[in-house]
């Protein structure tokens, strides 16, 4: 099974496509098709495995879920990946774990809505779900927060579309979706190293960073630290940062740094 990665975005963050694409192809593969779902087409060339689809006019944020629901209802993919536009790869992808996830989804007869691929689900309440080829799988408990999440995940399209209710923003998609997902009969799962699991204990497919945002304000900051890794102090290597700077992938005046205990620390790179 081969699936595509979909990334919702907006005009304000079109500039993130270039550093995202660079780290994606460096730390994973140029054979995976990536589809950006945005509004105004970017004014730069995309790598061969990247595609930009315009959803129309970049207007009210409340149209976010409606635009995505309409798009995903128009395609035939049974399974797909999705993530946010400001969470890029920071080190090599565990391709073996990724392939095993696809293998499990093809072979199991259990209902799975979302398969988390990074250090996310396992940091909250979870329990044993299954074992597949030597790897433990855990599911989010009903009381867990962020059962519905925009973090790197594989989704069955039917379940994803169900949660794109009209008038939702990315934040209410996660908040309301989590409430609506409780007891709905769909598994929300991820990898685990130990059984019974003790957080944080998972094996992750992707190690990622996240741009520093505070509610609806953008501080023009780029987090170089890995926020979804077993080692929270691991950062994107200097060589990769230097390569992207030479290619002018960052806007003038962008600040580089790290986040610790919800505080921003500027660093020189």
Residue ranges and their predicted role:
Residues 1, 228-269:
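Membrane-proximal basic amphipathic "stem/tether" segments
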Residues 1-60, 65, 70-79:
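N-terminal anchoring/stem segment of glycosyltransferases
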Residues 91-123:
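Conserved donor-nucleotide/metal-binding helix-loop-beta segment in metal-dependent transferases, i.e.
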Residues 147-228, 232:
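Catalytic core and acceptor-binding pocket of nucleotide-sugar-dependent glycosyltransferases
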Residues 18-21, 62-69, 94-103, 170-178:
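Well-ordered, non-membrane alpha-helical segments in soluble/globular domains
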Residues 128-145:
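Short, flexible, basic/aromatic active-site loop/helix in glycosyltransferases
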């Amino acid at each position: 099974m081969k699936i595509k990665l979909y990334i919702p975005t907006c005009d304000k963050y079109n500039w993130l496509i270039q550093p995202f694409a660079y780290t994606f192809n460096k730390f994973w593969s140029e054979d995976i098709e990536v589809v950006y779902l945005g509004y105004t087409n970017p004014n730069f060339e995309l790598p061969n495995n990247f595609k930009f689809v315009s959803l129309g006019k970049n207007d009210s944020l409340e149209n976010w879920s409606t635009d995505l629901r309409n798009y995903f209802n128009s395609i035939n993919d049974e399974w797909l990946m999705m993530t946010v536009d400001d969470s890029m790869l920071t080190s090599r992808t565990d391709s073996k774990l990724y392939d095993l996830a696809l293998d499990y989804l093809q072979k199991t007869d259990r209902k799975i809505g979302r398969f988390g691929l990074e250090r996310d689900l396992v940091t909250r309440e979870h329990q044993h779900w299954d074992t597949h080829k030597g790897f433990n799988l855990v599911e989010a408990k009903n009381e867990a927060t962020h059962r519905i999440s925009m973090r790197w995940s594989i989704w069955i399209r039917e379940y994803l579309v169900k949660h794109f209710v009209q008038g939702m923003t990315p934040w209410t998609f996660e908040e309301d979706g989590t409430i609506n997902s409780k007891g709905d009969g769909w598994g929300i799962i991820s990898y685990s190293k130990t059984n019974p699991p003790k957080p944080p204990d998972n094996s992750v497919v992707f190690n990622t960073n996240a741009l520093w945002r505070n509610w609806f304000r953008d501080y023009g900051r780029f987090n170089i630290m890995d926020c979804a890794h077993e080692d929270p102090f691991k950062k994107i290597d200097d060589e990769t940062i230097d390569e992207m700077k030479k290619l002018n992938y960052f806007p003038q005046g962008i600040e580089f740094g790290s986040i610790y205990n919800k505080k921003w620390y500027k660093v020189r790179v």
